[in-house]
């Protein structure tokens, strides 16, 4: 483009008069024509500039040219290629120039243009215009162009004679001049000496030529130029648009307005450009631009004008080109270096051509083809236009203007009545003659002042569409900016730099946007807009947005070069390679220009919405009083609203505001009559926007803003939607980069690699350092954002757009204090870094307020602030910040579609919140209003919400395409949008939140404190997958109730440390994705909670209060629609749930090691399913206060160290929960697999029950008022129907109802006995109690004869009677359905719980968990010891013992623990009591007891393990090793009793209130066992199933061992009664007395009442009512008992407890049946158990005593033998009665007799052999001296009587853990005869070998011993061993052999032995 001529910038003085140079006339005419052609020939028609066609008076200096046609192709060559703008036509009506001859140097040169018309077209560039950059000429300086033109004229236009003549005239004129024309160093002048130095005879200096003199003359003439342009009209035609943009300028004047004076600084020259009547119209396209209007010639006006063409600037690639002193050089010197001349003409450089382009680049006219450059003109391109011009010319030589009326367009922009004035004042310092000055002292000073009045513009919707279309066309080529351009070369200019000061003043700027689409159809639209443009204060009657800017002052200052003698270092541009940097340039980099600065001040800026009826609403407003409205909080609040300020607020839409804009500003505090409103703030006088930037350096633009208030009314967006919808179709993504631009290489210019370039590139800074230069720094004291949402319509169907004045929720204010925003420039290097920071925002504090509709003050509920410093710290606080960065993302898309991912990083040091219930309610209303507003505003379906608002994020408004990615992902795939992603990372160091929750009883507020540390939020969009992910993590949190005493509710279990905890407490991940094929939205929510404790302290009212606190109000969030599919996953790990009862001091902890739950909620689903899997679930309890929690690797150890005891554990739990979302909302819970484990001691289990019961009081049953039952008028005697003699009648023995009595008692009725014996015991008979048929499965091993079943039942003869069977029709269909007796109601309930497979193990430990229990036992032991010592003293003194000694020497604690004298020996056998015992025996017993106590309790001290006990005082407490009967008081390591239930299935149904049945529980267990783990017990299973009864019946397949049904019946009084039914399969019991005593002691334990932590509340004072059983039915239970007694309680015998007689006998196979019992009206479980015991015990004693006695061990053998004898006699008789075959009966009887007799004989023999073996082993121990060593191990803990039977008199209780476990010798029996013989041989050989070794070892021992009796003792000790060892082996061999034979004959007994023995 053009460069500013030198005379515009450096001519700061009045030109002196040039010497009178007389030129020849012919030379003058030829020179004039040549100059015009050289200057204007390329831009206009060339023939019009011929000397013959120019109307001129050369003598007067007047030249006039009419009807000039602009050469469009030449103008288009100067338009940049990326700009899609082309000139289609242009005309100049008249061009007039006046040269004031002969006073050329004093009078001005006047040039005027009249009626300039230019038509441009905005469209996509054509292929022809794309190559115009290659033909653009190079740029040359104006001085160079003038010099070249002068030289060309002299050497080509003139011949030698004319040139000689011209040189002589110039020489003569210079000699005659008395004034040195170059004293002031005129541009183009040459430094000559005084006039006297030039003489006619002296030749000109060698360096002065005629061309230089001629160039100086031209420069002096142009310095006096005055230019004027009138009637300028520029039209812009936009492609595919109906309207044309027309810019009209009335007049442009350029003149010299300097005064003839010189100040002390030097001479100054003032020039001015005045532009008048600027307007912009939108003209309809029907009115085409006039073809070529040739108006009538007008008179020449004397006014001085100037041209704007001379003010055009260069492209601006080199900053020095903008200075207007560029051309001030010596015209004798050429600026072209050899390198520049040698460069190709098509190479793009920073130099561009101007209007005085050098003739060296153009061919001469005289040369062939000189006119090829101007062939294509505007007329030739438009044939129609050319024909019209020819027609006009044929009519008249001077055509008349057209008179056709033209429709006027709609005015859009106006500059008002004031002119745009540009003043330029150039001042050059005075230089005295002969004084040598430096360049710095000779620098000119230029001052430019631009004054603009009021600019007013009004945009209609169609205008906005027009401009957007134009911008869209320009945007289409914005992506081509990265096409590499030519490299800039550093300018090597030695001219001094001008000191420039430029100031621009704009009075006001108004922009009005009419958003009402119907406004364009108004009849008075034209007049209204014209009136408003003329006077902006005139209102526009259409709804519109008005932007106002007042008093804009912009100032630019440039001090010039600091040292122009050295070339300035040019910073490489992004398209310049570092290879262009030479070594010498880097050395002078510090001598560049001093930084220039730019300053912009704006008085005021505002944006208002003007609605109809005079309503005005603010949108953007600068308010200096905002920052003084309240004081910022300096410390975090602790309670209440301390630290949270308040501010006045009001709804700006509440009232009509028609006054000034100050009505919406904040009123300063303290203003008033009494308060002296003199608090006049000075902020109003200052600018609201202040911008300052130092140019030419890396400093950023600093923008200071006053307090800014932004009003966001969502109804405004609703009113703008029609406009946005009309504009949205114009917004479309840019087209891909054309191939012709993509083919341009990144470095199209070859560069020479030199050593200097390599060194310079190495010393250059890295690209990343330059890429992060700060571009702008914006600072604002306070920014307030006020948001309001209009109330939704009353009915959803109403979707009308209203004014939005009604408000339902409230207003949200966001105040940002101390805002500092920094924007980085990342486009300075060619290679951008991988990650670059784009912007960074910091602020001191941000407060979020909320004010409801009725409130006049707003209170903040959220504050973002820096961390509060610790006391005494003076560190600079870390401010909250938001950083915006971008980095490339990996993508599989094409390279042209990949965009950078935007990263937003937010660092918030601290967040404080104070949330009240009105605020929560208001925010919920606000959120609901926004949601419903979106539904209403975007409900018509014409466009999606993202489409209307898409232009807001477009590049027109500074947005980014990437910000829209994944915002609405259910649209068609868009490559440009998908390729861009976004990541948001939020880091919060601390959160302190206070919740003020109203209490349910309206007694005030409950205050909750929520604190969290190290909170992180991360959001990431995956464009390729159409997925958005959100992650939330909290490392530490604390949620407490601080209303009175702080109670922690939720928090990390143990203190947070960096080494112990790595996982966050809360982790949330939300992923939203959309399937592009199916357009289904899917949401995945994952919640992970770990290492936390949730506590429920003494009440749960706060849960209801928080639920009520967060509950949405009625009518809120009712229209929300879920996504198509929602997946929810919840994971809990290392979680603890602390349950603190309301009254007791203890607590329960539920531990969760791992829980995972998953659910899916499809859109429109009728039910939801939740699947949960658990592992490691446990329950612990503590009796009192617990100790502090310490870090441990195991979660259970953490609580155990604090004093908790393990009680329950769930190893595996898998459940499935299904809930109906419609209808009645039924809930179904299926537990597919569960494994439960209970471990407890007597005291901890009781405490757990008490705490659980107390905690259950927190959930009282909501019972309705009792319904009053109707009363009868008369009484009824309920005993009228009672038969008093009913029980006195003897029952009929032979009746069918009493058939079961045959086995209850001894048979005595022969008739009935004969009938019963007809049925074989192997026949599948009817159950004697239930009437049910039980199948009998037999094997050949059980002694059944082959073919027995085929021959009939028990050999009976079946007779078939003749005759046909008559079948009754419909009989089978009419049979009634038999209801299962265990399923009263099969209808599932509203809540159905089903357990499919579960197992339960209960481990009962010996000892006690609580220190309180152990301490009570220890204290009682000491008390009993003191009493015994006192009694011993009394007995020693001779006093007699009385009956009171029994109470004094014993005590019973907790109804379970006996402390006192052991009743054994003579004392135990005495039936008289201690009071009548012998004193010696009593004293011996007391001494033995005291010695035992001394040994057990006084032996040593020990320290309990950490955490054993409750409370801190129990930790690390030393106490004595107290033992009770040889056992420790702490919990035993191993369980003593194990209760196992497996195969559990349960159905639980809860029915709605309208049903008569309230609940139903059906419980079944496939296996039930009780294992005996007591070390002194040799039996394995205390209770198990019975393999087969005495009749051979075995258990059915898949039969349940235990079945219980419990049904709850709802009464009219809303009370429930229970119905219980239970059935248990036959049980097999192996009862050891130690195990029985342990169970009695365990379950009879009654802990002392716990001290209540607080008085019972009113609702908990009433005791929990006991269960009331309306009906109880227990089906018969068959038992088979083995019992081994070990001691007898003689005290119980003396008290009359006959059950103690069982301890005298050893029972084996004793059978009994607990009869079928039906009860009614039983209250409580304890009453139920007592009643059952009272009914069953007498029945067993009365009716089944024979069966029980037959189980005594010696009697049992005789009974079995007697049964064989009976079979030998009775079976032949029975068989004879049946079929008369006596032989078969004899055979069966004989087999039974032989088998039973043989079994008993072998059994008795084995027992005798085992007993003999034990006696021999004990004798060996006594004789061999090993009685105290291993006799226990050999005997294996058993004592036998003389008959070899296990003795029941073994004294002592259950052993301690230190004792060795006893193993019975009957365990591990051989299974067959073969194994028996092998075991016998092995035993016999082992003992014989031992005897042999003993005999062989005697001689050696005799030899070694010395003395008289040594050898004798050795022989005596060896003889018994040698004799007894073979005997022991023999007895053991006999026992093994007999046991093997017995097990071979009776396999069923072998299986029972595996269950019996350990």
UniProtKB/Swiss-Prot annotation:
Polar residues bias spans: 397-406
Reactions performed catalytically: a 1,2-diacyl-sn-glycero-3-phosphocholine(in) = a 1,2-diacyl-sn-glycero-3-phosphocholine(out); a 1,2-diacyl-sn-glycero-3-phospho-L-serine(in) = a 1,2-diacyl-sn-glycero-3-phospho-L-serine(out); a 1,2-diacyl-sn-glycero-3-phosphoethanolamine(in) = a 1,2-diacyl-sn-glycero-3-phosphoethanolamine(out)
GO CC entries: endoplasmic reticulum membrane; phagophore; phagophore assembly site; phagophore assembly site membrane
One GO term (biological process): autophagy of mitochondrion
Protein origin, superkingdom: Eukaryota
Keyword Transport applies: yes
Pfam families membership: ATG2_CAD (PF13329)
Protein name from the UniProt record: Autophagy-related protein 2
The organism of origin for this protein: Cryptococcus neoformans var. neoformans serotype D (strain JEC21 / ATCC MYA-565) (Filobasidiella neoformans)
UniProt lineage: Eukaryota, Fungi, Dikarya, Basidiomycota, Agaricomycotina
């Amino acid at each position: 483009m053009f460069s500013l001529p030198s005379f515009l910038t450096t001519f700061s003085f009045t030109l002196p008069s040039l010497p009178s140079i007389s030129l020849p006339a012919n030379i003058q005419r030829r020179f004039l024509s040549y100059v015009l052609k050289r200057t204007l020939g390329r831009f206009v028609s060339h023939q019009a500039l011929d000397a013959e066609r120019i109307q001129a008076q050369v003598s007067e200096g007047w030249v006039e040219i009419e009807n000039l046609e602009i050469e469009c192709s030449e103008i288009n060559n100067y338009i940049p290629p990326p700009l899609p703008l082309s000139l289609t036509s242009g005309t100049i009506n008249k061009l007039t120039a006046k040269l004031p001859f002969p006073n050329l140097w004093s009078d001005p040169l006047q040039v005027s243009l009249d009626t300039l018309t230019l038509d441009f077209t905005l469209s996509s560039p054509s292929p022809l215009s794309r190559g115009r950059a290659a033909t653009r000429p190079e740029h040359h300086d104006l001085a160079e162009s003038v010099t070249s033109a002068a030289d060309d004229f002299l050497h080509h236009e003139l011949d030698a004679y004319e040139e000689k003549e011209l040189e002589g005239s110039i020489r003569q004129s210079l000699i005659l001049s008395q004034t040195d024309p170059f004293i002031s160093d005129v541009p183009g002048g040459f430094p000559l000496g005084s006039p006297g130095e030039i003489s006619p005879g002296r030749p000109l200096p060698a360096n002065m030529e005629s061309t230089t003199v001629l160039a100086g003359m031209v420069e002096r003439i142009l310095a006096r130029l005055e230019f004027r342009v009138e009637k300028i009209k520029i039209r812009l035609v936009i492609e595919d648009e109906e309207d044309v943009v027309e810019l009209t300028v009335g007049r442009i004047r350029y003149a010299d307005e300097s005064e003839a004076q010189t100040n002390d600084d030097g001479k100054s020259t003032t020039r001015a450009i005045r532009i008048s009547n600027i307007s912009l119209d939108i003209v309809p396209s029907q009115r085409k631009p006039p073809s070529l209007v040739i108006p009538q010639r007008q008179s020449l006006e004397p006014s001085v004008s100037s041209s704007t063409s001379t003010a055009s600037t260069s492209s601006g690639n080199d900053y020095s080109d903008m200075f207007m002193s560029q051309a001030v050089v010596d015209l004798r010197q050429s600026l072209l270096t050899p390198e520049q001349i040698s460069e190709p003409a098509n190479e793009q450089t920073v130099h561009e051509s101007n209007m005085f382009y050098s003739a060296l680049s153009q061919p001469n006219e005289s040369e062939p083809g000189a006119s090829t450059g101007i062939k294509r003109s505007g007329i030739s391109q438009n044939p129609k236009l050319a024909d019209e011009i020819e027609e006009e010319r044929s009519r008249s030589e001077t055509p008349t203007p057209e008179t056709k009326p033209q429709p006027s367009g709609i005015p859009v922009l106006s500059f008002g009545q004031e002119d745009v004035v540009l003043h330029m004042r150039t001042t050059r310092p005075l230089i005295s003659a002969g004084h040598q000055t430096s360049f710095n002292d000779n620098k000119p000073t230029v001052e430019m002042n631009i004054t603009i009045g009021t600019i007013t513009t009004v945009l209609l919707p169609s205008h906005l569409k027009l401009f957007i279309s134009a911008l869209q066309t320009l945007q289409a080529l914005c992506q081509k900016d990265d096409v590499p351009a030519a490299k800039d070369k550093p300018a090597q200019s030695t001219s001094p730099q001008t000191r420039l000061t430029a100031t621009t003043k704009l009075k006001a700027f108004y922009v009005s946007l009419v958003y009402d689409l119907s406004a364009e159809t108004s009849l008075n639209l034209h007049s209204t807009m014209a009136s408003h443009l003329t006077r902006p204060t005139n209102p526009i009657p259409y709804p519109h947005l008005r932007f106002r800017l007042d008093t804009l002052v912009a100032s630019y200052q440039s001090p010039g070069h600091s040292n122009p003698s050295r070339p300035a270092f040019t910073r490489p541009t992004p398209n310049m390679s570092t290879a262009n940097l030479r070594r010498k340039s880097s050395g002078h980099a510090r001598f560049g220009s001093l930084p220039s600065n730019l300053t912009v001040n704006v008085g005021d800026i505002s944006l208002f919405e003007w609605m109809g009826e005079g309503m005005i609403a603010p949108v953007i407003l600068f308010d200096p009083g905002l920052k003084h409205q309240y004081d910022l909080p300096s410390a975090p609040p602790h309670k209440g609203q301390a630290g949270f300020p308040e501010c006045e607020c009001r709804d700006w839409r509440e009232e009509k505001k028609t006054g000034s804009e100050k009505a919406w500003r904040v009123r300063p505090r303290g203003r008033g009559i009494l308060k002296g409103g003199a608090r006049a703030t000075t902020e109003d006088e200052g600018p609201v926007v202040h911008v300052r930037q130092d140019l030419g350096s890396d400093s950023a633009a600093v923008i200071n803003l006053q307090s800014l208030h932004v009003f966001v009314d969502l109804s405004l967006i609703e009113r703008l939607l029609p406009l946005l919808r009309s504009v949205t179709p114009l917004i479309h993504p840019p087209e891909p980069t054309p191939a012709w631009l993509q083919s341009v290489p990144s470095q199209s210019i070859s560069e020479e690699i030199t050593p200097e370039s390599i060194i310079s590139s190495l010393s250059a800074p890295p690209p990343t350092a330059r890429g992060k230069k700060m571009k702008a720094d914006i600072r604002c004291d306070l920014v307030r954002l006020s948001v309001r949402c209009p109330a939704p319509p009353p009915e959803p169907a109403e979707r009308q757009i209203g004014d939005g004045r009604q408000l339902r929720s409230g207003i949200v204010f966001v105040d940002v204090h101390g805002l500092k925003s920094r924007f980085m420039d990342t486009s300075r290097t060619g290679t951008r870094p991988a990650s670059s920071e784009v912007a960074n925002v910091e602020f001191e504090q941000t407060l979020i307020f909320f004010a409801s509709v009725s409130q006049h003050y707003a209170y903040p509920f959220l504050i973002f602030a820096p961390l509060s410093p610790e006391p005494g710290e003076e560190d600079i606080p870390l401010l909250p910040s938001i950083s915006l960065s971008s980095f490339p993302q990996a993508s599989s898309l094409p390279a042209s579609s990949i965009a950078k991912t935007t990263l937003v990083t937010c660092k918030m040091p601290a967040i404080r919140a104070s949330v009240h219930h009105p605020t929560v309610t208001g925010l919920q209303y606000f959120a609901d209003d926004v949601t419903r507003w979106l539904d209403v505003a975007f409900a018509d379906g014409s466009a999606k919400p993202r489409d209307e608002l898409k232009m807001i994020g477009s590049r027109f408004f500074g947005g980014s395409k990437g910000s829209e990615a994944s915002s609405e992902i259910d649209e068609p795939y868009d490559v440009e949008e998908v390729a861009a992603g976004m990541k948001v990372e939020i880091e919060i160091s601390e959160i302190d939140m206070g919740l003020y929750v109203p209490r349910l009883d309206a007694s005030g507020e409950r205050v909750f404190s929520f604190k969290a540390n190290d909170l992180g939020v991360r959001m990431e969009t995956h464009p390729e997958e159409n997925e958005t992910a959100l992650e939330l993590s909290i490392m530490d949190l604390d949620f407490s109730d601080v209303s009175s005493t702080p109670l922690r509710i939720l928090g990390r279990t143990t203190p947070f440390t960096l080494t112990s905890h790595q996982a966050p407490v809360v982790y949330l991940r939300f992923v939203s994705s959309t399937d592009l094929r199916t357009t289904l939205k899917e949401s995945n929510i994952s919640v992970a909670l770990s290492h936390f404790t949730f506590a429920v302290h003494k009440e749960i009212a706060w849960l209801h209060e928080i639920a009520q606190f967060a509950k949405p109000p009625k009518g809120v969030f009712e229209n929300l629609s879920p996504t198509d599919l929602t997946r929810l996953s919840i994971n809990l790990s290392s979680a603890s749930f602390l349950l603190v009862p309301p009254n007791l001091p203890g607590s329960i902890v539920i531990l969760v090691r791992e829980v995972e739950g998953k659910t899916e909620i499809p859109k429109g689903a009728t039910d939801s399913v939740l699947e949960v899997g658990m592992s490691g679930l446990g329950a612990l309890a503590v009796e009192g206060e617990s100790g502090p929690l310490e870090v441990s690797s195991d979660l259970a150890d953490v609580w155990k160290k604090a004093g908790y005891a393990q009680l329950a554990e769930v190893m595996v739990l898998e459940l499935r929960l299904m809930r109906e979302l419609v209808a009645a909302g039924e809930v179904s819970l299926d537990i597919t697999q569960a494994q439960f484990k209970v471990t407890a001691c007597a005291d901890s289990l009781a405490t757990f029950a008490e705490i659980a019961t107390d905690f259950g009081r927190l959930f009282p049953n909501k019972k309705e008022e009792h319904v009053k039952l109707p009363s009868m008028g008369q009484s009824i005697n309920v005993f009228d129907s009672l038969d008093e003699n009913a029980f006195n009648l003897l029952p009929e023995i032979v009746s069918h109802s009493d058939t079961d009595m045959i086995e209850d008692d001894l048979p005595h009725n022969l008739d009935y006995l004969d009938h019963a014996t007809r049925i074989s015991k192997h026949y599948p008979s009817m159950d004697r109690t239930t009437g049910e048929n039980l199948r009998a499965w037999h094997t050949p091993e059980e002694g059944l004869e082959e073919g027995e079943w085929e021959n009939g039942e028990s050999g009976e003869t079946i007779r078939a009677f003749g005759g046909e069977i008559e079948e009754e029709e419909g009989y089978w269909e009419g049979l009634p359905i038999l209801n299962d007796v265990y399923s009263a109601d099969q209808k599932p309930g509203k809540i159905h719980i089903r357990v499919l497979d579960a197992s339960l193990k209960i481990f009962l430990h010996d000892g006690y968990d609580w220190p309180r229990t152990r301490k009570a036992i220890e204290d009682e032991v000491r008390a009993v010891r003191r009493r015994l010592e006192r009694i011993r003293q009394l007995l020693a003194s001779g006093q007699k013992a009385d009956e009171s000694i029994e109470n004094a020497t014993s005590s019973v604690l907790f109804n379970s623990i006996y402390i006192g004298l052991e009743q054994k020996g003579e004392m135990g056998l005495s039936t008289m009591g201690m009071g009548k015992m012998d004193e010696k025996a009593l004293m011996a017993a007391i001494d033995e007891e005291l010695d035992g106590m001394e040994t057990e309790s006084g032996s040593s001290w020990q320290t309990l393990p950490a955490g054993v006990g409750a409370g801190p005082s129990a930790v690390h407490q030393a106490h004595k090793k107290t033992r009770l009967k040889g056992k420790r008081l702490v919990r035993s390591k191993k369980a003593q009793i194990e209760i196992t239930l497996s195969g559990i299935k349960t159905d639980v149904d809860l029915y709605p209130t309208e049903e008569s049945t309230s609940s139903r529980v059906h419980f079944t267990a496939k296996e039930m066992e009780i294992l005996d783990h007591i070390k002194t017990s040799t039996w394995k299973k205390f209770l198990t199933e019975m393999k087969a009864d005495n009749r051979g019946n075995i258990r059915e397949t898949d039969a349940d061992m235990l079945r219980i049904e419990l049904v709850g019946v709802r009464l009219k009084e809303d009370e429930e009664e229970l119905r219980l039914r239970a059935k248990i399969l036959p049980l097999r019991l192996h009862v050891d007395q130690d195990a029985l005593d342990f169970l009695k002691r365990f379950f009879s334990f009654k802990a002392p009442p716990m001290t209540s932590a607080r008085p019972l509340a009113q609702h908990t004072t009433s005791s929990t009512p006991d269960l009331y059983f309306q009906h109880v039915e227990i089906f018969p239970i068959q038992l088979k008992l083995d019992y081994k007694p070990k001691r007898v309680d003689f005290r119980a015998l003396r008290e009359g407890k006959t059950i103690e007689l069982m301890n005298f006998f050893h029972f084996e196979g004793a059978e009994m049946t607990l009869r079928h019992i039906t009860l009614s009206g039983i209250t409580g479980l304890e009453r139920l158990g007592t009643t059952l015991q009272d009914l069953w015990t007498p029945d067993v004693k009365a009716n089944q005593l024979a069966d029980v006695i037959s189980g005594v061990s010696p009697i049992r053998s005789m009974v079995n033998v007697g049964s064989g004898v009976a079979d030998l006699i009775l079976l032949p008789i029975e068989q004879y009665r049946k079929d008369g075959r006596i032989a078969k009966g004899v055979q069966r009887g004989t087999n039974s007799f032989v088998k039973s007799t043989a079994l008993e004989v072998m059994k008795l023999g084995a027992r005798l052999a085992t007993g003999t073996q034990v006696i021999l082993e004990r004798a060996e121990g006594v004789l061999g001296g090993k009685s105290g060593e291993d006799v226990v191990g050999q005997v294996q803990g058993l004592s036998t009587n003389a008959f070899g039977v296990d003795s029941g008199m073994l004294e002592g209780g259950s052993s301690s853990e230190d004792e060795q476990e006893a193993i019975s010798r009957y365990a591990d029996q051989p299974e067959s005869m073969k194994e028996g013989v092998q075991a016998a041989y092995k035993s016999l050989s082992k003992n014989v070998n031992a005897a042999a070794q003993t005999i062989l070892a005697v001689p050696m021992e005799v030899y070694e011993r010395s003395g008289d009796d040594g050898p004798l003792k050795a022989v005596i000790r060896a003889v018994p061993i040698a004799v007894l060892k073979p005997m022991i082996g023999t007895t053991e061999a006999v026992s093994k052999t007999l046991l093997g034979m017995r097990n071979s004959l009776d396999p069923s007994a072998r299986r029972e032995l595996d269950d019996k023995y350990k």
